[in-house]
Amino acid sequence: MRAIAFFLCAIVVVSPLSAQQQVITDLPEVRGPFTLTAVYDSAAGHNAFAYAGKTVPPVIRVLPGRVIKLRYANNLPRKSDEECATGRCGNVSNLHFHGLHVSPERPQDDVLTMMSMPGEILEYKVVVPSYSPPGLYWYHTHPHGESARQDLDGMSGAIVVEGDASRLVVESSMKHERMVCVSKRSP
């Protein structure tokens, strides 16, 4: 059976949660340099992002023309019992900054050669262009062959490029930000 993933950050209607699901009403936010860690969450039984002692990915907030400085530590186990697209998963990992018009070169958004094996660290310095429109973007793992499993586990988060959104918002009642991030992996 195929695993099904769902990641969405938007205004949505959410059905009641089962006893095992949880709603986190205050997502952590970061505006400056920070460390994000890939870990195995034994309580949840899958891989996750860890930030500030919790397995909840932070919302990255940035202004156009600024730099996202991020240290990404791969603390995933060296061995995995799961199968990936190319065989046994090796828990290699990296990050992709989806939707941002940024350089595909190191140390920005190089998803092809910038990889970390378990125990390794990657340093990202992502320059958000000054012409970037305000809006909602996202980051997620992107190692080809393994990203589906990692993304299905919830190894993704939101990026908010801040700025003057008045030209984008017509109704004054819509000027209040509401963000819902949903991520789900079926067994």
Describe every region a protein language model picked out.
Residues 5-15:
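Bacterial N-terminal signal peptides
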Residues 78, 134, 147-149, 167:
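Short beta-strands and strand-coil junctions in structured, solvent-facing domains, enriched
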Residues 149-179:
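Extended, polar beta-sheet/loop recognition surfaces of beta-rich domains
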Residues 136-138:
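Short, conserved beta-strand segments of beta-strand-rich sandwich/propeller modules, principally
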